[in-house]
Amino acid sequence: MIKVMVMKIAVIGGTGDQGLGLALRFAVAGEEVIIGSRDAEKASKAASKVLEIAGRDDISVEGATNPDAAASADVVVLTVPLQAQMVTLASIRDQVRDKVLIDATVPIDSCIGGSAVRYIDLWEGSAAERAARFLREQGTRVAAAFNNISASALLEVSEPVDCDCLVASDHRDALEVAAELAEKIDGVRAIECGGLENARIIEKITPLLINLNIRNRVRNAGIRITNLPEQE
């Protein structure tokens, strides 16, 4: 089993469905969560929504601006659409110095007005690699994770999430932190996939899952990797 860590987690872009779902799952798992947004009031409303969905008052979740959330956190999870990725990273660049940042960005065509089932090839290879390149001088260790987990499944907090979480990073500590966070979500198993270049493959799975949702009229298509040894 992965060692248990207690973390203060900033979910940047946490007012969208993916970010809200991750914030919800981390909070009910006992973590201290800060939802980040460009608008502090919007972030506070999202935090209140997490409390409402959870139906509990014993969880720790609050809202803040993106820079304030990132500054206060031990680990930062980025959950913004592709078109907002770089401007958001620029706004928190100083606040993520020497921290682990987990990027859940997926480059899909719907981010620029096209199809949600079409992947956009990026010059850097993947959205996570683009983030790592941008933050390299800050000493930020970037991991790719949560790209393939359905937002609607995350928000159905009474049900386990039937999906593995594929994790990639060039830094051992970032891999471990991302895997630890993933396995705080009921039903999720973290699969360490190696270096960050593997994010190119991980990110491309998401438009396929969206296509399967559409074709089969479901919402929560996920991925499971079989016949692997138990990870210690």
Curated annotation (Swiss-Prot):
pH dependence of function: Optimum pH is 8.0.
Keyword line: NADP, Oxidoreductase
A GO BP entry: copper ion import
Source organism, top-level taxon: Archaea
Pfam families: F420_oxidored (PF03807)
Reactions catalysed, as given in the entry: reduced coenzyme F420-(gamma-L-Glu)(n) + NADP(+) = oxidized coenzyme F420-(gamma-L-Glu)(n) + NADPH + 2 H(+)
Any one GO MF annotation of this record: cupric reductase (NADH) activity
Oligomer and partners: Homotetramer.
Purpose: Catalyzes the reduction of NADP(+) with F420H(2) via hydride transfer, and likely the reverse reaction, i.e. the reduction of F420 with NADPH. Probably functions in the regeneration of NADPH required in biosynthetic reactions. Is specific for reduced F420 as electron donor for the reduction of NADP; neither reduced FAD nor FMN can act as electron donor. The enzyme is also specific for NADP; NAD is not utilized as substrate.
PANTHER family, per database record: DUDULIN-RELATED, F420-DEPENDENT NADP REDUCTASE
Family membership: Belongs to the F420-dependent NADP reductase family.
Name of this chain's protein: F420-dependent NADP reductase
Taxonomic lineage of the native organism: Archaea, Methanobacteriati, Methanobacteriota, Methanomada group, Methanobacteria
Gene from which this protein is expressed: fno
